[in-house]
Each structure stands twice: as structure tokens, then as C-alpha cells.
């Protein structure tokens, strides 16, 4: 099952604008498929991994009004992170540090 169905959906929520290197996420929905046993945290990690590897971290990415946060709220009914800072204990910080 693919939750993210097509490019128009991605453009609608603004994911296409997050990459500094490329705004082309046409392969996004083909790259990440989610099995019925995957939870939203795994999906979030997969999407964050894609964005981070492509160099698409921008200021305000995880704010309350950010497109990415709205995207996850729409699909999973929750924000990405309760704590949106880049503190040492956040998932995003740990993921960036591994790169």
C-alpha cells in the first residue's frame, strides 16, 4: 500500500519545495511504500531520511505552520515532534549526526 499516492499530493503539502538541491520529488511516492505493520514513526523516519540526504533542511521546517508538519498531521493526526528544537536528544539531531 502506498500512502503517498502522487506528485500532486506532495506538491499540495509543499514537500517539493524542501530540497535545496532539487525540487523534483516525482519519484517520492515510488521510493517509499508502507506495509500494514509500519507505524507512523517509521514512516516519519523514512521521509526525514529522504529529505536530509537530499540536503533539504531549511529554517522553519518543523514549525507548527510548516508544510511538513501539516502533511503529517493530515495523514497521521499528530505533529512530527513535540519538541521542534534541534536539541541533542531529538530524533532529527541524532539522524543528522549520523551523516
Swiss-Prot record:
This is Putative uncharacterized protein DDB_G0282013. It comes from Dictyostelium discoideum (Social amoeba).
Amino acid at each position: 500500500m502506498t500512502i503517498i499516492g502522487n506528485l500532486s499530493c506532495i506538491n499540495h503539502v509543499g514537500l517539493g519545495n524542501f530540497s535545496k538541491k532539487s525540487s523534483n520529488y516525482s519519484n517520492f511516492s515510488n521510493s517509499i511504500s508502507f506495509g500494514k505493520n509500519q507505524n507512523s514513526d517509521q514512516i516519519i523516519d523514512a521521509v526525514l531520511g529522504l529529505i536530509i540526504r537530499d540536503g533539504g533542511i531549511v529554517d522553519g521546517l518543523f514549525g507548527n505552520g510548516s508544510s511538513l508538519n501539516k502533511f503529517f498531521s493530515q495523514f497521521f493526526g499528530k505533529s512530527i515532534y513535540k519538541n521542534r528544537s534541534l536539541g541533542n536528544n531529538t530524533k532529527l539531531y541524532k539522524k543528522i549526526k549520523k551523516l
